[in-house]
Amino acid sequence: MDQSSGKGSGRDVGVAPVVLTILDGWGHRNDSEHNAIRQGDTPVMEALWHAYPHALIQASGSHVGLPDHQMGNSEVGHLTIGAGRIIRQELVRISDTVRDDQLNNTPALVELAEHLQNDTGTLHLLGLCSDGGVHSHVNHLCGLIHWAAAAGIKKVAVHAITDGRDTPTQSAMGSITLVQRAMEEAGVGHLASLCGRYWAMDRDKRWDRTEKAYDLYTDPTRSISDQSPQQLLAESYAAGITDEFLKPVRLSDDVMQDGDSVLVFNFRPDRARQIVQTLCLDDFDGFERRTTPKLDVVTFTQVEQDLPVSVAFPPEPLDDLLGQVVAEAGLRQYRTAETEKYPHVTYFMNGGIEQPLPGEERHLVPSPRVATYDLSPAMSADQLTDSCIDAIDQGTYSLIVINYANPDMVGHTGVMDAATEAIATVDRCIGRLLDAVGRRGGTMLITADHGNAELMQGPDGQAWTAHTTNPVPCILVEGEQRKLPGHGNDISLREDGGLADIAPTLLQILNLEQPAAMTGRSLIEPVSNVDPSPLSARLPLPV
């Protein structure tokens, strides 16, 4: 277990907490076919939906600073929730730069080009070759290839990581074809390796996976395949191995060597962090590296503070976030999740800041060590609930944020039976949390960061492992000691809201002033037809 807290924290005694419960990947879709949420056993959520103020809110596209019709994701969702405003996300920021042909005006890339123009080293472009838009975008890679040609960089090796998680499970060839076409048009570059994201993009310190990817990129003794990408993928599919799990394979003799440069074009940091650490840290100790070439590493965005890398698109600072407002009011807050979502309720929700805020305590519950989460659909939800109930019972935290990873992580496997079990587990845990909150007279705001588990099969009959653009539920369970001034229980939630409105809603419940920079609006509005009975008497909830 990992517990940490900020220094200089205030202390409340006997606090009625406000508990933000984020159901990661719990979207709304009316059709029950291929819908793990509709088919799962959810008596608690169904009862809450009918008894308390609720709404469907938006968690994708322009509502969270992404292009229209772009599915939301956990990083963007938690950042938007914490910021209380719509932020131009990195996908849009980088896409605009590529579209406007402005990569050559990016200082880190200018320096990189000058270095390679004066040296014999190779530029290695490493990242997820995908049009999913969650961690990267293939258009960015194609733009980099054209930029390299225009900058006079002669030797370019592309190390393509295949997706199959944020895209259909057998769709890699479409993106690879786009990259091959870009290299032909630019007259520079070749495909040096292929590797499924399962190996190259682990974020849970499963170093045996990362080691396989690292060896692929750096070990000169590894054999080179004489098959084309099309042949390799067809052979993989025939063996039941989809894009996400594609085994690492070298396609040329271009490995990373002393004096080479590496540009990691994933813009989302959480799944780029481990492979970047292996490439740039002298004191890396996750596994024993067979070779340690001296590389000049550039990342598209800040992967981690204090890494010895250049950053092409440095973070744009954010102020007056939810956590900051709570901390500045002298209130204590508690953030908890299991390993897979821990960075989201901490780092991402705090606007990319690693260190806890004053009065912020963090608690990490380890995720189970399994190959894929369909093998353990309950994940660590029960242990996570236990720890959160302990925090509620302490009576010292004004704001508690908890993330349940199951709908998203099990939804990504595409295994329907496992996903319905995951949904039932989370529903049961919500009931347990609700009892604890009710004992304290607190309030729960239940929502999700994006959709996933409500769609488990695509129109082509393949397992649907990606997120969705569906709206997500938001339910306000108001407690006796957190009644809103002037409203009592006579409230409802707006139907036109989005994730940017969650923080203003929480601040209203906490009776804290919303800062001007937080441009979202509280979802709460007065109405006269809500059951006025207290939380403890509203309905018997199954646990």
Swiss-Prot record:
Active site: residue positions: S74
CDD domains the record matches: iPGM
Cofactor(s) required for function per UniProt: Mn(2+)
Alphabetical list of Pfam families matching this protein: iPGM_N, Metalloenzyme
InterPro entries reported for this sequence: Alkaline_phosphatase_core_sf, BPG-indep_PGM_N, Metalloenzyme, PGAM_B_sf, Pgm_bpd_ind
Gene Ontology cellular component terms for the protein in this record: cytosol
Pathways per UniProt: Carbohydrate degradation; glycolysis; pyruvate from D-glyceraldehyde 3-phosphate: step 3/5
BP GO terms, sorted: glucose catabolic process; glycolytic process
Cofactor note: Binds 2 manganese ions per subunit.
Catalyzed chemical reaction(s): (2R)-2-phosphoglycerate = (2R)-3-phosphoglycerate
Sites where the protein binds substrate: H135, R165, D166, R197, R203, R268, P269, D270, R271, K341
GO molecular function, one term: phosphoglycerate mutase activity
SUPFAM superfamilies recorded: 2,3-Bisphosphoglycerate-independent phosphoglycerate mutase, substrate-binding domain, Alkaline phosphatase-like
Enzyme Commission code: 5.4.2.12
Assigned keywords, A-Z: Glycolysis, Isomerase, Manganese, Metal-binding
Chain residues that bind Mn(2+) 1: D408, H412, H467
Subunit structure: Monomer.
Task performed by this protein: Catalyzes the interconversion of 2-phosphoglycerate and 3-phosphoglycerate.
Protein name, per record: 2,3-bisphosphoglycerate-independent phosphoglycerate mutase
Gene source species: Parasynechococcus marenigrum (strain WH8102)
Taxonomic lineage: Bacteria, Bacillati, Cyanobacteriota, Cyanophyceae, Synechococcales
Name of encoding gene: gpmI
